[in-house]
Amino acid sequence: MIKRNANGTWTAHNVPIGTNPAYAQALVDYFNALDPLFAKAQEKSDFEFICTLINVQGMQDAGWDAFETTQDIFETFSRLKSKVRYNTEQLHLFLVLYGLILEASYPYDLLCNLLRVISGDRYSAFCFPDIKMGKNGKSRSMFASEKLNKIKELAKEQGLEKNIEPLVRIFDKELRNAIFHSDYCLYDDEIRIPSPTRIYKTADVMNLINKTLAYHEVMVRLVKMYKATYEKPEIIDVHPDFSNDPDEKVVVMVRKGTGAIGIKDNWTQEEIAHGKIPFRLCRLLPYEQKMLQKDPLLADFPENKVDKFNKILRHFPEPVKKRLLPVFERML
């Protein structure tokens, strides 16, 4: 439906009948706004760009990628929509989904780090440090609105304000707060917020929600698309501030059908034995970790077996799933 031409411009083709117009137009607008951020960051530094895509967060095993859960919730709500019979019930679902998309941490981290990398700065696992509260030593996490303000500042410094417009356009602080505090009312064709007093037309909110769904879809697809640009393990330069060793290079770790899943040192076993320091920055599945333990030089992994098995299990009822799961786990 949405394709990028040779000039890098995204356009819509053969839009399915029944597609919401606001959603379809937002897809085009948001791809054209956000794609250049990915392209500029990749051009600046493959090393820092890959760290940004895989969202390096230090030492973690499987099961700590919150954005995977966000995508699962998105897909679950999409399936639920077809089972809900009444418009008000669908609206409640969409309002919650709107709030969840606005609160998801990774898209904020992603945009912040893309802007950092473009500026020549480095990837940071802590783009949004906690804010200290008074003299008692306590602190709190940044609110989503505060994260947005920081992203706007970074974009302004580089003349890229237009590229973050997708997030700015969909962000309604009062509506978000009302949803998560259960402080809104559906009445006739309106959504009402008692405090602060606001009245939205339901049609306007649905237009906003469709744009928000498009924003989420674009972010997910761009991450997948740019990961897939790394089809085979390749040797790349590190950031100048990463290592003092002039010979330091890294290898891009890839998974068939996914693309980049991390980076690792490019030292041979002999070089490591003579004092070179090995390292890995990656997100691996449990069975891939075992593969890497057996072969520390491994950088080219087969397709995701877990996804493959999950697609099969999805078609079975829970009792059958529980019996099949141990069988599949032994096959990994």
Q: Which residue stretches match the model-derived regions?
A:
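Extended intrinsically disordered or low-complexity regions, especially N/C-terminal cytosolic tails and loops
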Residues: 1-97, 236-332
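Histidine-centered, metal-coordinating catalytic motifs and their short helical/loop contexts
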Residues: 164-193
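Charged/polar positions within long, soluble alpha-helices
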Residues: 116, 177-188, 217-224
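Amphipathic, Lys/Arg-enriched alpha-helical patches that create a basic surface
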Residues: 192-245
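Eukaryote-specific, cytoplasm-facing alpha-helical/coiled-coil scaffolding segments in long proteins
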Residues: 126-142, 234-252
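Amphipathic alpha-helices that form helix-helix packing interfaces
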Residues: 66, 73, 100-103, 107, ...
